[in-house]
Structures are given as structure tokens and as C-alpha cells.
Amino acid sequence: MEDAPDSAGRDGIDAEREKQSGIEAMIHTNINVVYLITDGVPEHDVTFLGRHATKLWKVFNGSSSIGIVSAGSCRLGVIRGAFDNLVLSKLYREGSFGVITKSGGLSNEIIWICSQFADGITTAIGIGGDAYPGTDYVSYLDMFENAPQTKAVDLVGEMGGDLAERAAEWYGARERRGADRAERTPAGPEHGR
């Protein structure tokens, strides 16, 4: 990383060097998202990188992730595969669905479904199938909640872990926050209600 120009990407990092490479990437002020596709990274390294990213206000996605794609903008990783699939999934323009998955195959399937039977996706994120992903569902749900173009989020989990339970708790708290705001908003036509 030290010798790479600011605009250069870096790939081909093996599991043993992933922790150090992740730390080096997070040091750079112009890098806000660190994405790692590598399988077989020790869990303690992944949890360290996740905590380190949080301290630095960065996003660490992975490891063992198929990638991230923002329609009409960029793709990190191999999500949706070959260029032909990107075009067939209409990823050249933004839709209104967010996608968060642990499964690479299911992320590709959900993107395809959203593009064929709806207006497509805003962003799709494969967080990786490992037991301890660098970023959990809740962090990405917060991101989508603050993205006005995203009207719905399709969250697809896998067996094991408590990520889905934490996402359900987040959603329940979100509903309560919405009810609290509605109670504080004055009623009547002069207030838009």
C-alpha cells in the first residue's frame, strides 16, 4: 500500500496479510471503505479490523464478501459477475431497493429479481458469510434509512449468529422512533397533517 498511488486499487492480499493490509488502507484519509474478499481470515483479525474501522469512522466490509455495488456508480468485488450480468441487471441506473446479504449467490439472485420485477437497486452489499463480518446489518440499515432514494431494503441472512435478531431489534426501535416523532408533530392542515 505504501508505494501505491492514491488512485490505485489493491487486490491479491492473502488471508495471512489481510489484517496488516486492512490497517494500512484505513490509515489513508482518502479511503473510507475497506473491502476484503479473502476467505479463511482468522476471526480475531476480522473483529479487530471491524473495531479499528469503527474507531476511524471507516467502513470495513468482509471478509469473505462478494462485494458492494451502487447502481450507476461503482462496484467493488465480483458482485453480479461478468459485465453482461451488470447490464442485464440494469446496474447502469439507480433503482429504489437496497440489498444486504451474507450470501454471495443470494445477493446476485436478489439483484436480478429487483431489476426484473421492480425498478432495480440503489446499493447491494454482500457482508460476507463468515461468523464475524466486519460490518453488520444494522450499520448498513442505518445507511439505507438515511438514503432518500432507497424505498425498501431486502435483507437476506444465513443460519447462525445473531445478526438477524439485532436487525429486528433495530427495526422495532425504528418503528418506535417513528411513532414518537408522529406524537410530537402538531396535527392540523397548517402543519401538513
Q: Where are the model-predicted features located?
A:
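Catalytic-core regions of core metabolic enzymes
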Residues: 1-193
